[in-house]
Amino acid sequence: MMQKQNMIVVNQKEIAKNIYELVLQGDLVQQMNDPGQFVHIKVAEGITPLLRRPISICNVDQDKNEFTMLYRAEGQGTKTLAKRKQGELVDVLGPLGHGFPVEEAESGQTALLVGGGIGVPPLYELSQRLVAKGVRVIHILGFQTKDVVFYEEKFAELGDTYVATVDGTHGTKGFVTDVIDSYGIDFDILYSCGPLAMLRALEGRYKERKAYISLEERMGCGIGACFACVCHLQADPSGHSYKKVCSDGPVFPIGEVVL
């Protein structure tokens, strides 16, 4: 159930180049039950920036009432958020959207989790949930270069983990699909989050497989009211049918929406 709460900053640190790990504490964490959901953050106490920023939920610790977000500080809003200090309050709206269907993976099956860049974080909570129900997980994490690689060790604690960098400075040189080809990786179910180019490449290969993708999209309201994040449905060539990434997604079955 969506709620709004001023949450306490427990810790914030830069874990890779311009990539920040922010831990917040508050009762809102008890509502965070579906990996792949996101929160809408008011990055500053004043009216500037006006719009909230959508950030995915990376890790949930309901015993401590804490959750972790990872984000890239690149625009005015996220750079402002990166300045928030321990003990300060952050206005959080969430959890929002529909997450990854953990129930679609069965114990004993193999799940392939593919993340690209800042699409990697929501896969961490998902992986933990899958492992807890006896699913074997394989992770492929794609980044531009070594300086922006993060959470490789944390994913490796949960299952086989491969890293690809476009420039070859760490792991396999190339894209996540190059890792799949190089190691002959197969799976029963696929979960993915990342840039559209990566999602399109996966859809081209696995449209007939059991697979779910999470879209990264700019949002205004985060609750389906402003229609800033609509995406069209593949089943309607006329383009009249659509879904909203913030409220209907961000996770969709592969092949459902136009990428």
From Swiss-Prot:
Binding site residues for FAD: R53, P54, I55, S56, L70, Y71, R72, G77, T78
Residue numbers binding [2Fe-2S] cluster: C221, C226, C229, C246
Key words of the record: 2Fe-2S, Electron transport, FAD, Flavoprotein, Iron, Iron-sulfur, Metal-binding, Pyrimidine biosynthesis, Transport
TM spans (from-to): none
Cofactor note: Binds 1 [2Fe-2S] cluster per subunit. Binds 1 FAD per subunit.
Subunit structure, as described in the record: Heterotetramer of 2 PyrK and 2 PyrD type B subunits.
Role: Responsible for channeling the electrons from the oxidation of dihydroorotate from the FMN redox center in the PyrD type B subunit to the ultimate electron acceptor NAD(+).
Protein name (record): Dihydroorotate dehydrogenase B (NAD(+)), electron transfer subunit
The organism of origin for this protein: Bacillus mycoides (strain KBAB4) (Bacillus weihenstephanensis)
Protein's gene: pyrK
